[in-house]
Amino acid sequence: MNWTILNVSIPVHDLNKSKEFYEMLLGVREKQEELYQPLFQNEESVFLGDKGFGLRLFKPKPDLLIADNIQSRRSFVTLLVESIENIKRNLEVKNIKFKINDCKNDKSIKGIFVQEPSLNLIHLVENKNGFNEDLNGWNMGLDWGIHHMNLESLNVRDSIDFFCDIIGMKEGKWIAPVNKGDFSIDPSELAILPLSNNNRGLHVIKPDDGFGYRNNFAHNPSIGGHPAFTIKDLSSLKARLDKEKILYSDAKVYAMPG
């Protein structure tokens, strides 16, 4: 199954303040076109990117107000895949519940929402216009791209089996730098579904409560899931964060060669 990361969605409390923050990180783009938006209304989300690729910020609603719809209270990923029908059949065979849009008109996008075994919400969208797994932000004229999405899993192997057996993805091997940080790359604790040879793709990790402490980080990247972005000038970003007195962890080259 060919696939790539189309976008990531992050729940936020204040859309305007969050938009300002992410524009500081990724830059401002005035003209942008958003596709593949079956769940959120415009006034409830902000999209940074173009033609469906990018970052969506959304404000969760009270659960009792969304009727038969679904939402996530943590960040989730949208994957572009070459065939929804194959995935749908695999889900039905395993009796895994999912939500699929019904494509009532020509503008509808065929997509599925499903939870993998650790209950991470996964959005799968079919690409009707030919497939290019190298799709990333610079293809859309952006100055940034999505490097990976990190998914927290209490059973890494169960999650990987889901992505491989149900979605049709292929597991890879973690490529560590010479000066790797203090964390496990045992496939039962950290596994990768790669899009490249530099660890771009989906990372599935078992939460490690000592991760931040052992690596002298201000935060713990193994808990809760997160997106990682590729930008052109990390030094300038660090200077902006310092100026705004925003706390960050300088990870250097601890997990991936580069």
Predicted feature locations:
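Core segments of cupin and vicinal oxygen chelate
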Residues: 1-2, 9-55, 152-201, 243
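A short, acidic/glycine-rich surface segment
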Residues: 33, 62-67, 130-136, 179-181, ...
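Conserved beta-strand in the GNAT
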Residues: 56-58, 113, 123, 203
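Hydrophobic, well-ordered secondary-structure segments
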Residues: 143-146, 160
